[in-house]
Amino acid sequence: MNSSRFLYRSRQFWQAISTRSSQQDVELVSSILSPVQVELFQRMQKSEQFHSLVVLNELRNRGEDNTDLLTAALLHDVGKTQAPLRLWERVMIVIVRAICQDCVQKWGTFKIDHPEKGLGWRRAFIVAEQHPAWGADLAAECDASPLAVSLIARHQEKIHPEVSSVDDNLLRKLQSVDDNN
Protein backbone atom coordinates (compact mmCIF):
# COMPACT_ATOMS: atom_id res chain seq x y z
CA MET A 1 0.00 0.00 0.00
CA ASN A 2 1.56 3.31 -1.06
CA SER A 3 1.74 6.32 1.27
CA SER A 4 -1.14 8.23 -0.34
CA ARG A 5 -3.40 5.17 -0.03
CA PHE A 6 -2.30 4.75 3.59
CA LEU A 7 -3.19 8.37 4.33
CA TYR A 8 -6.53 7.91 2.59
CA ARG A 9 -7.31 4.82 4.67
CA SER A 10 -6.17 6.60 7.84
CA ARG A 11 -8.55 9.46 7.08
CA GLN A 12 -11.34 6.96 6.45
CA PHE A 13 -10.62 5.28 9.78
CA TRP A 14 -10.80 8.60 11.63
CA GLN A 15 -14.05 9.51 9.89
CA ALA A 16 -15.52 6.13 10.79
CA ILE A 17 -15.11 6.85 14.48
CA SER A 18 -15.85 10.57 14.54
CA THR A 19 -18.57 11.47 12.01
CA ARG A 20 -21.76 13.37 12.73
CA SER A 21 -24.51 14.53 10.39
CA SER A 22 -25.40 18.21 10.21
CA GLN A 23 -28.87 19.66 9.75
CA GLN A 24 -27.77 20.67 6.25
CA ASP A 25 -26.94 17.01 5.50
CA VAL A 26 -30.37 15.90 6.72
CA GLU A 27 -32.07 18.51 4.53
CA LEU A 28 -30.00 17.51 1.50
CA VAL A 29 -30.83 13.83 1.92
CA SER A 30 -34.52 14.68 2.36
CA SER A 31 -34.48 16.74 -0.83
CA ILE A 32 -33.35 13.72 -2.88
CA LEU A 33 -34.89 10.69 -1.19
CA SER A 34 -38.52 9.91 -0.41
CA PRO A 35 -39.45 9.73 3.29
CA VAL A 36 -39.27 5.92 3.30
CA GLN A 37 -35.88 6.05 1.53
CA VAL A 38 -34.66 8.58 4.13
CA GLU A 39 -35.57 6.04 6.82
CA LEU A 40 -33.57 3.44 4.93
CA PHE A 41 -30.59 5.84 4.68
CA GLN A 42 -30.81 6.49 8.42
CA ARG A 43 -30.49 2.76 9.15
CA MET A 44 -26.92 2.86 7.84
CA GLN A 45 -24.04 3.29 10.25
CA LYS A 46 -22.94 6.91 10.66
CA SER A 47 -19.68 6.22 8.83
CA GLU A 48 -21.62 4.77 5.86
CA GLN A 49 -23.95 7.78 5.86
CA PHE A 50 -20.93 10.09 5.85
CA HIS A 51 -19.32 8.17 2.99
CA SER A 52 -22.55 8.30 0.99
CA LEU A 53 -22.82 12.05 1.55
CA VAL A 54 -19.23 12.51 0.38
CA VAL A 55 -20.02 10.51 -2.78
CA LEU A 56 -23.20 12.55 -3.33
CA ASN A 57 -21.46 15.89 -2.85
CA GLU A 58 -18.59 14.96 -5.15
CA LEU A 59 -21.05 13.99 -7.89
CA ARG A 60 -22.91 17.26 -7.41
CA ASN A 61 -19.62 19.19 -7.50
CA ARG A 62 -18.98 17.56 -10.89
CA GLY A 63 -22.31 18.93 -12.11
CA GLU A 64 -24.31 15.71 -11.84
CA ASP A 65 -28.02 16.18 -11.19
CA ASN A 66 -29.57 12.92 -12.36
CA THR A 67 -31.97 11.95 -9.58
CA ASP A 68 -31.36 8.22 -10.03
CA LEU A 69 -27.61 8.71 -9.80
CA LEU A 70 -27.94 10.88 -6.69
CA THR A 71 -30.31 8.38 -5.09
CA ALA A 72 -27.83 5.59 -5.80
CA ALA A 73 -25.02 7.70 -4.34
CA LEU A 74 -26.91 7.93 -1.06
CA LEU A 75 -28.09 4.31 -0.95
CA HIS A 76 -25.32 2.36 -2.69
CA ASP A 77 -24.05 0.85 0.59
CA VAL A 78 -27.43 0.39 2.28
CA GLY A 79 -27.14 -3.38 1.89
CA LYS A 80 -24.56 -3.28 4.67
CA THR A 81 -27.44 -2.65 7.09
CA GLN A 82 -28.29 -6.34 6.70
CA ALA A 83 -25.12 -7.25 8.60
CA PRO A 84 -23.34 -4.12 9.87
CA LEU A 85 -19.58 -4.42 9.86
CA ARG A 86 -17.49 -3.75 12.92
CA LEU A 87 -14.49 -1.49 12.51
CA TRP A 88 -12.00 -4.36 12.75
CA GLU A 89 -13.88 -6.18 9.98
CA ARG A 90 -13.59 -3.15 7.70
CA VAL A 91 -9.86 -3.00 8.40
CA MET A 92 -9.54 -6.72 7.66
CA ILE A 93 -11.29 -6.29 4.29
CA VAL A 94 -8.95 -3.45 3.32
CA ILE A 95 -5.86 -5.42 4.29
CA VAL A 96 -6.95 -8.61 2.52
CA ARG A 97 -7.95 -6.64 -0.61
CA ALA A 98 -4.48 -5.09 -0.68
CA ILE A 99 -2.87 -8.52 -0.45
CA CYS A 100 -5.31 -10.77 -2.34
CA GLN A 101 -8.28 -9.21 -4.14
CA ASP A 102 -9.34 -12.61 -5.45
CA CYS A 103 -9.57 -13.92 -1.87
CA VAL A 104 -12.16 -11.29 -0.93
CA GLN A 105 -14.25 -12.23 -3.95
CA LYS A 106 -13.84 -15.98 -3.39
CA TRP A 107 -14.64 -15.86 0.33
CA GLY A 108 -17.49 -13.42 -0.25
CA THR A 109 -19.44 -15.44 -2.79
CA PHE A 110 -20.66 -18.00 -0.26
CA LYS A 111 -24.47 -18.15 -0.50
CA ILE A 112 -26.20 -16.77 2.57
CA ASP A 113 -29.93 -16.37 3.12
CA HIS A 114 -29.77 -14.62 6.49
CA PRO A 115 -26.80 -12.20 6.51
CA GLU A 116 -27.55 -11.01 10.03
CA LYS A 117 -26.58 -14.48 11.33
CA GLY A 118 -23.12 -14.28 9.82
CA LEU A 119 -20.71 -17.04 8.95
CA GLY A 120 -17.75 -16.67 11.26
CA TRP A 121 -14.60 -15.40 9.63
CA ARG A 122 -16.25 -15.16 6.18
CA ARG A 123 -18.94 -12.76 7.37
CA ALA A 124 -17.08 -9.53 6.53
CA PHE A 125 -16.17 -10.77 3.06
CA ILE A 126 -19.73 -11.88 2.38
CA VAL A 127 -21.00 -8.41 3.32
CA ALA A 128 -18.31 -6.75 1.20
CA GLU A 129 -19.23 -8.80 -1.86
CA GLN A 130 -22.99 -9.19 -1.48
CA HIS A 131 -24.16 -5.85 -0.06
CA PRO A 132 -24.86 -4.41 -3.55
CA ALA A 133 -27.55 -7.03 -4.23
CA TRP A 134 -28.98 -6.70 -0.73
CA GLY A 135 -29.03 -2.92 -1.08
CA ALA A 136 -30.78 -3.09 -4.43
CA ASP A 137 -33.49 -5.26 -2.89
CA LEU A 138 -33.95 -2.82 -0.01
CA ALA A 139 -34.06 0.17 -2.36
CA ALA A 140 -36.62 -1.56 -4.58
CA GLU A 141 -38.79 -2.24 -1.52
CA CYS A 142 -38.67 1.52 -0.85
CA ASP A 143 -39.84 2.34 -4.38
CA ALA A 144 -36.52 3.53 -5.76
CA SER A 145 -36.60 3.75 -9.56
CA PRO A 146 -35.43 0.75 -11.59
CA LEU A 147 -32.35 2.71 -12.70
CA ALA A 148 -31.39 3.66 -9.12
CA VAL A 149 -31.88 0.03 -8.07
CA SER A 150 -29.69 -1.12 -10.97
CA LEU A 151 -26.94 1.36 -10.10
CA ILE A 152 -26.96 0.16 -6.48
CA ALA A 153 -26.91 -3.50 -7.52
CA ARG A 154 -24.04 -2.96 -9.95
CA HIS A 155 -21.90 -0.42 -8.09
CA GLN A 156 -19.03 -2.91 -7.64
CA GLU A 157 -19.40 -4.54 -11.06
CA LYS A 158 -16.62 -4.28 -13.60
CA ILE A 159 -17.89 -2.59 -16.76
CA HIS A 160 -16.43 -3.33 -20.15
CA PRO A 161 -14.71 -0.13 -21.37
CA GLU A 162 -16.39 -0.27 -24.77
CA VAL A 163 -19.91 -0.33 -23.33
CA SER A 164 -21.43 3.13 -23.41
CA SER A 165 -25.12 2.90 -22.53
CA VAL A 166 -26.60 5.75 -20.50
CA ASP A 167 -26.93 3.42 -17.51
CA ASP A 168 -23.31 2.31 -17.74
CA ASN A 169 -22.08 5.88 -18.05
CA LEU A 170 -23.95 6.78 -14.86
CA LEU A 171 -22.53 3.67 -13.20
CA ARG A 172 -18.99 4.68 -14.19
CA LYS A 173 -19.53 8.09 -12.57
CA LEU A 174 -20.80 6.49 -9.35
CA GLN A 175 -17.94 4.00 -9.27
CA SER A 176 -15.31 6.63 -9.94
CA VAL A 177 -16.41 8.77 -7.02
CA ASP A 178 -17.10 5.80 -4.72
CA ASP A 179 -13.69 4.26 -5.41
CA ASN A 180 -11.93 7.53 -4.57
CA ASN A 181 -13.86 8.16 -1.37
Q: What does each of the following model-derived ranges do?
A:
Residues 1-39, 156-163, 168, 179-181:
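Non-catalytic interface/linker regions that flank or bridge core catalytic/transmembrane domains
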Residues 38-51, 56-181:
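Divalent metal-dependent catalytic cores for phosphoryl transfer on phosphate-bearing substrates
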